[in-house]
């Protein structure tokens, strides 16, 4: 199965993935695959396993069972270079995961300098380009405490992009941002999608999903309940659990 999928250009193959914390099984046998440049949105109620799933993909949470194959290589903690995996898979978290004592420019340049041994001037030059990309050139010398939540999250996105990832994971990137500022982050993500970035996005932003997603996966209780195009999942959901969830989200 894995070999056939990879021969068709799959960047990610997840097979029968399980994750338990003690006696609590959070992911209960999830399987899916992704093409290069595909945009995948994960949706579902709180506690459905969405965030745990993306954290298993880049080995922040090692799976309890199952297989993750990324870019043609089976990911195993003892055989695969996990640090290299995290260079190739960028992640943006719910909270603004930026260093409070560093400026926006320093936050973005740090990874390439420390991990990839890029020359400081070159790293800072690219950091300025990335700040422009996310609309924050004027914030280069500002520290996180001097920026809004939306600005901090855009710095976090730029910092992940500085490592030139092959896949970007977004774990509810707008959940901690004031409603009035959510569009700042979503606009950047739409731009990345338009440029062909391969993305997995955990979100409840249905408008974003309709605009960007090639495919939507709906999860509940650690399982994939439904999967399809945005039109199929949002306009013609087949499962009662999906219908119930969407009716509540759309009324919120």
Residue ranges and their predicted role:
Residues 7-14, 18-230:
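ABC family nucleotide-binding domain
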Residues 1-6, 242:
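Pre-NBD coupling/linker segments of ABC/ABC-like ATPases
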Residues 231-252:
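C-terminal boundary and immediately downstream tail of ABC-type ATPase nucleotide-binding domains
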